[in-house]
């Protein structure tokens, strides 16, 4: 059993305590003021991550495992490996062996399918390999990987029956890469708990005469993901979203260039350029995911004047509630021992996954 003393920070409170744990938290004993030299926060939860450190989900299990390890070293103790839009065969080959090889000591818990059922006129950096809604495709992927989330465009033909099928199979539906109007979104939101993918980006906007996906999200949604690298979304837009959406949570949308030096790279057959912590399609201004870590997002939230409790909420707790992951996202007796230790300047000291300190 391990014992640590420090300031525990949850989404709704902070207090000094001594915490005893192995795989789960056994005891939390509140103490008098120790120091602010050590913060203990819940491990980060990233529900949208394509890659990192030169590895990409679409390159198969070995790459998935290595990119997950990279993000674990930066505090992400729960992660969804996220696909790009591609051919059914490429996606299947990329995810083959996912469930078979998944370890109980991994930070991976499943996959997020970003596409291929998106609007070909709102691709962003996604390849032009969109598909029509297909239950058969989902059934094939379910045999090899646990699909937690899927991003799709609700305006596509055949989507109403498809969304109903996905909900029956406990797959969270998120709207993204879409040109749907407000009424189209609202129709689904009245029936299902719909999420939204990288809010503001690759979706119809908040036009006052022709409200779109963003309008529907800001007015009606309980949960949405947002990239807080401060390249995809401005400080002001983040704060507007947070006022409107109580369960707003940050994701990285990180690609394989995360952790690499500036230069040109190819991931999932997509040519990109990384320059000063920003990544675009080669010879284009179109953003192509991010190179942020969840810890980068956490620090950015603090820098734009969110409290540390609010930053914890947006980097861990809200995502846990969205996916109903009841044993993480909170430092409490009986919960998994997934947490990040920070110094007084909020630099990462150590990361614990299932009670084990990981090698960085």
What are these regions (language model features)?
Residues 143-262:
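Active-site core of metal-dependent hydrolases
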Residues 70-80, 120-144, 186-203, 213-221, ...:
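Active-site gating loops and adjacent loop-to-helix segments of metal-dependent hydrolytic enzymes
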Residues 1-33, 352, 356-357:
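N-terminal metal-binding scaffold of metallo-dependent hydrolase/deaminase domains
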Residues 43-45, 111, 174-175, 250-251, ...:
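Residue-level marker for buried hydrophobic side chains located in beta-strands
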Residues 213-223, 243-252, 258-342:
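His/Asp/Glu-enriched, well-ordered alpha-helical/loop segment
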Residues 50, 65-91, 106-119, 145-155, ...:
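Divalent metal-dependent hydrolysis catalytic cores, especially in the metallo-beta-lactamase
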Residues 37, 48, 113, 166, ...:
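Conserved, mostly hydrophobic/aromatic
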């Amino acid at each position: 059993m391990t014992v640590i003393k420090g300031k525990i920070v949850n989404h709704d409170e902070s207090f000094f305590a001594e915490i005893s744990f192995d795989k789960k938290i056994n005891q939390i004993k509140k103490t008098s003021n120790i120091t602010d030299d050590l913060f203990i926060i819940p491990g980060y939860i990233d529900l949208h991550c394509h890659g990192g450190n030169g590895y990409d989900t679409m390159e198969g299990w070995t790459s998935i495992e290595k990119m997950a390890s990279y993000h674990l070293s930066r505090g992400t103790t729960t992660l969804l490996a996220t696909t790009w839009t591609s051919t059914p065969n490429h996606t299947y080959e990329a995810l083959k062996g996912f469930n078979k090889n998944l370890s109980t000591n991994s930070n991976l818990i499943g996959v997020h399918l970003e596409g291929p059922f998106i609007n070909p006129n709102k691709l962003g950096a996604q390849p032009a390999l969109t598909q029509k809604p297909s239950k058969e495709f989902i059934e094939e992927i379910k045999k090899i990987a646990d699909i937690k989330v899927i991003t799709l465009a609700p305006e596509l033909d055949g989507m109403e029956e498809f969304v109903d099928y996905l909900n029956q199979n406990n797959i969270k539906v998120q709207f993204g890469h879409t040109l749907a109007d407000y009424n189209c979104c609202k129709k689904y939101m009245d029936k299902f708990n719909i999420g939204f993918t990288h809010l503001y980006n690759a979706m119809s906007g908040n036009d006052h005469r022709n409200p779109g996906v963003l309008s529907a999200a800001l007015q009606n949604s309980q949960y949405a993901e947002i990239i807080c690298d401060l390249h995809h979304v401005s400080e002001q837009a983040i704060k507007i979203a947070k006022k409107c959406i109580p369960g707003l949570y940050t994701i990285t949308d990180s690609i394989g260039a995360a952790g690499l030096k500036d230069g040109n790279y190819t991931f999932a057959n997509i040519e990109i350029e990384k320059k000063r912590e920003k990544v675009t399609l080669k010879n284009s201004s179109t953003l192509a995911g991010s190179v942020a870590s969840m810890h980068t997002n956490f620090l950015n939230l603090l820098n734009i004047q969110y409290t540390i409790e609010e930053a914890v909420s947006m980097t861990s707790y809200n995502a846990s509630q969205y996916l109903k992951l009841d044993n993480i996202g909170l430092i409490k007796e009986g919960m998994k021992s997934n947490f990040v230790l920070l110094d007084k300047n909020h630099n990462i000291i150590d990361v614990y996954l299932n009670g084990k300190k990981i090698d960085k």
